[in-house]
Amino acid sequence: MNKNVMVKGLTALDILTSLGCAENISDQPHSIAKAEKNVKEITDATKAPYNSVVAFAGGTGVVVGKNTIVTNKHIAKSNNIFKNRVSAHHSSKGKGGGNYDVKDIVEYPGKEDLAIVHVHETSTEGLNFNKNVSYTKFADGAKAKDRISIIGYPKGAQTKYKMFESTGTINHINGTIMEFDAYAQPGNSGSPVLNSKNELIGILYAGSGKDESEKNFGVYFTPQLKEFIQNNIEK
């Protein structure tokens, strides 16, 4: 991946600054104008698919089964992941699903930026994780020109972890790499990429440093990746 491609997690910005990419992620009027057409805040995240989305410190994840969240390796590797709790479908106005401590992490053994995070079932508020989230179903597949949406927490700390959804189109898929034009920002790492039926196609992991509204990248869930995830869902 070239210098204009950058990881979308706030935890990675220190590394990327040396590549001259970090400043390109914000304050681009032409990008913002495009984003206004296809980005909306989700103020009530208590219903599917929004209640399957969780916030990490500097990233996003999606619930796929009992106590089981899918996100990026670079989010899971964050030094803060065990210190900062996972917040289930936090939004600006809706009732959140609780804050949960991380139990363990399982990284995908291949090069793909994919990891499984297991959380403890009971939140600090005494809520049950599995009763307060929904599990996102996997899509059978996807192809170029399919419409998609991504849901997550762009610039989480700056926006006080408001949830946003953006829509776009798949440009192409090559193996486990998916390129699409849905707008994303730092904090969207690990955001679910959903089809028109709100089925899980993959997760976002990086984007273009020139114009995030034109080119972003996701880990496309091939049968092999889906098998890895399913084998690591808590029973």
Swiss-Prot record:
Catalytic residues, chain numbering: 74 (charge relay system), 113 (charge relay system), 189 (charge relay system)
Recorded consequence of changing residue 124 to I: In strain: VBI-M0894
Main localisation: secreted
GO terms, biological process: proteolysis
Subcellular location: Secreted
GO cellular component, one term: extracellular region
Short name of one Pfam family: Trypsin
A molecular function (GO) term: serine-type endopeptidase activity
EC number from the UniProt entry: 3.4.21.-
InterPro entries for the chain: Peptidase_S1_PA, Peptidase_S1_PA_chymotrypsin, Peptidase_S1B, Peptidase_S1B_tx, Trypsin_dom, V8_his_AS
Database matches in Gene3D superfamilies: Trypsin-like serine proteases
UniProt effect for mutating residue 21 to F: In strain: VBI-M0894
Keywords: Hydrolase, Protease, Secreted, Serine protease, Signal
Family per record: Belongs to the peptidase S1B family.
Entry protein name: Serine protease SplA
Organism per entry: Staphylococcus aureus
